[in-house]
């Protein structure tokens, strides 16, 4: 019951975010909207299981971040939420309630991150403004907001489903090196996408796809190596513990 209420509230919040942002800016044009819709849709299809097995890491986070930097909030929210919903229903074949939850989560996350970026003085209209040192704090504010809102909403649904506290789920699922490194890389990749788009226009899509592929592959290798090292250390620890416990049994009374 509580899980259903939570999902309903998140979906309603997503609808409220769309309403608050207003209709997409008509000055943006149909071609840029279509480009970023396809970019986000492609990112949604490139996903990785989360290292702890809870949820997944979506390469769409990079496209989401680039979109909210370059497009007005109204356009960014529509494009990113629509791309995620299409990916869930058409390609991933998720249940409608999960697709609706992801829609609401994406709309809320992107709207708040875009709000943080704009309200802190962020500019993404030209390459000079995007590369300006004055954009450092707005970009950081947007990235932190995106990460906290996104992971917080996911933690809420996992906590209700498994009967745990939100804080415990967030700490176990997101507050560790793999997730933080992955999120940081995706935000930086999104920033790079925005720079490439303002520099080379639609031709930047080819470089972005290549960069995404190699970064995704590198992250897979990084996580696999780190998990293998952790498993090896755990085995060695257990072996040492067993030897300590077994040592008294080897003594003989003379």
Question: Where do the protein language model's features map onto the residues?
Answer:
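Short helix-perturbing small/polar motifs within transmembrane alpha-helices
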Residues: 1-56, 60-217
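Membrane-proximal helical linkers
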Residues: 164-171, 222-254
């Amino acid at each position: 019951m509580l899980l259903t209420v939570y999902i309903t509230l998140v979906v309603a919040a997503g609808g409220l975010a769309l309403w608050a942002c207003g209709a997409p800016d008509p000055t943006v044009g149909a071609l840029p909207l279509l480009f970023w819709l396809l970019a986000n849709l492609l990112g949604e299809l490139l996903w990785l299981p989360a290292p702890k097995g809870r949820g997944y890491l979506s390469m769409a986070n990079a496209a989401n971040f680039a979109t909210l930097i370059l497009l007005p909030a109204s356009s960014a929210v529509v494009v990113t939420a629509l791309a995620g919903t299409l990916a869930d229903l058409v390609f991933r074949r998720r249940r409608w309630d999960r697709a609706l939850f992801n829609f609401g989560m994406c709309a809320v996350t992107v709207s708040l991150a875009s709000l943080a970026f704009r309200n802190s003085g962020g500019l993404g209209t030209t390459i000079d403004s995007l590369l300006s040192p004055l954009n450092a704090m707005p970009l950081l504010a947007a990235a932190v907001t995106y990460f906290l809102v996104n992971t917080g909403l996911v933690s809420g649904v996992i906590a209700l489903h498994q009967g745990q506290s939100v804080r415990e789920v967030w700490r176990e699922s997101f507050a560790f090196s793999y997730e933080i490194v992955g999120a940081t890389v995706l935000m930086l990749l999104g920033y790079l996408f925005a720079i490439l788009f303002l520099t080379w226009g639609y031709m930047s899509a080819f470089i972005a796809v290549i960069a995404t592929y190699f970064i995704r592959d590198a992250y897979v290798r990084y996580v696999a190596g780190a998990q293998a090292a952790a498993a090896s250390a755990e085995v060695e620890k257990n072996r040492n513990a067993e030897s300590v416990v077994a040592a008294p049994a080897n003594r003989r009374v003379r």
